Amino acid sequence: MAHLLLAVVAITLALSQSVFGGSPYSNPHFTGSRSVITHLMQWKFDDIAAECERFLGPKGYGGIQLSPVNEHAVLGNRPWYELYQPVGYKIQSRSGNEEQFKGMVQRCNKVGVRIYVDIVMNHMSGAQEGHGNCWFKLQWHHDVSRCSLLVPNDFHGRESCHTDNMDIKNYDNPEEARNCRLSGLRDLKQSSEYVRQKQADFLNHLIDLGVAGSRSDASKHMWPGDLEAIYGKLHNLNTAYFPANSRPFIYHEVIYYGGDGIKSSDYTKLGRAIEFHFYRDIANVVRRHNQLKTVKNFGQPWGMVPSDDALVMVDSHDLQRFHTGQVGVNINYFESRLLKVATAFMLAWPYGVPRVMSSYHWDQKIEDGKDKNDWIGPPSDGSGNILSVTPQPDDTCNKEWICEHRWRQIYNMVHFRNVAGNEAVSHWWDNGDYQIAFGRGSKAFIAINLQDGQGLNRKLATGLPQGTYCDLVTGNLAGGKCTGGTVTVDGSGNADINIAKTAEDPFVAIHVEAKLH
């Protein structure tokens, strides 16, 4: 019997791994049918905990990406990127302290929402004006723990970086990109066993507190072999929240658009790669640079990594500030119509693990293809304390916080994806140009109209059972009634789909859990 039980456990683990790809670090450990991550950029830990309980849990979100949580440089104008200049590995940031972090993780896990921490392992802060730094002669943030116990020999020096000022010049040269400094930030020598252990200790502390995994910032600038050695030291996830022997979920920032040099696939045995082709290619389609009909085989045939190795997005904290990509391609909340369409497609299309951006407001100032205000940090008071997020009666947030994850058109598409599950794309239709529709088996259906100056008015096969469905783009199913439009599916699975040429939200989405009768 014991041998049989062990065999069953082994088969279960093998099946779980096959669903989430070949890497032991590719499983996000969502609960139930949940399937979507949102990035709550630089929210306070207490606000995140409350959001899990009042919105993210009930609306079916699977997890949250946090901004970096460890002690960091404090720069004069409090830019958002100071969190990406760590000075040590104590949980202490603008978002809160360790006790607040611990409480947040517990409260979110309790309602089925996983936590993924943005981890900066490539570097420590540079010797810039400000305070919060360590061996490079600046004080500690909050004057805690006498630095991270790192010394100059724990960083790459001229013996391994040969550029004139030790900064990266050629980002496609693996040795230079991984041994030299990223924008002047002190590059950690992860071939050092001491550095590896320090970083593993920090990750293990987060794991023991109940996080499900992490985003690996700037993975492109770290040797895969060094990361593999560090990950080999990691604990399994906390069994108070996860099944025994669960490995942490890790997804890697590897900016790659094709060609030679450092590839996304170099990192997929260590988790998922953030697929930059995805945002760029869908942005070009939504902007009508390429025909919408071409997305019929969107994913790996477009040069992307396999679906089980991908995390996908249409916006991010870097993209919306044009730190990669460019003005006229990248889509963000300043162009809400385009963002909603791109996000709807991402959530309807069965490729990768999707992540939804949730932003705060800042005043863009575009000059010469750059945002001159791209440094502006989160909403804060005169002392630099981050302002709380306050939900409004209409489910939006106070004006300082954009809260795209609370937009009806987005959270209802999160539900769409959860309902569609592993169903394949079916009932594809297009007009040969900028109108498409497709189903997800017998569970869900979406139609999108980006045709210039032309509505979509057509009877289409949906694959859904006969009945009347709430259109989740224009409203919700509440109290047995639709607050928006409806779509009627006949006995043959067909429905009259109507999307006006001037529609603010040029798509219709229905699924079996929004069926009236």
Curated annotation (Swiss-Prot):
It is found in: Secreted. Optimum pH is 6.5. Active in slightly acidic to neutral pH range. Its main location: secreted. Monomer. The keyword Phosphoprotein does not apply. Keywords: Allergen, Calcium, Carbohydrate metabolism, Chloride, Disulfide bond, Glycosidase, Hydrolase, Metal-binding, Secreted, Signal. Chloride binds at residues 215, 355. Binds 1 Ca(2+) ion per subunit. The active site is at residues 217, 253. Its EC number is 3.2.1.1. GO terms for molecular function: alpha-amylase activity; calcium ion binding; chloride ion binding. Its cofactor is Ca(2+); chloride. One of its GO terms (cellular component) is extracellular region. The record marks 318 as: Transition state stabilizer. The keyword Nucleotide-binding does not apply. One of its GO terms (biological process) is carbohydrate metabolic process. It comes from the Eukaryota. Belongs to the glycosyl hydrolase 13 family. It is an enzyme of class 3 (hydrolase). This is Alpha-amylase. Residues 1-21 form the signal peptide. It comes from Acarus siro (Flour mite). It catalyses: Endohydrolysis of (1->4)-alpha-D-glucosidic linkages in polysaccharides containing three or more (1->4)-alpha-linked D-glucose units. InterPro entries: A-amylase/branching_C, A-amylase_C, Alpha_amylase, Glyco_hydro_13_cat_dom, Glyco_hydro_b, Glycoside_hydrolase_SF. Activated by chloride ions. Inhibited by acarbose. Not inhibited by wheat alpha-amylase inhibitors 1 (WI-1, the tetrameric form) or 3 (WI-3, the monomeric form) and bean alpha-amylase inhibitor 1 (alphaAI-1). Disulfide bonds join 52-108, 397-403, 470-482.
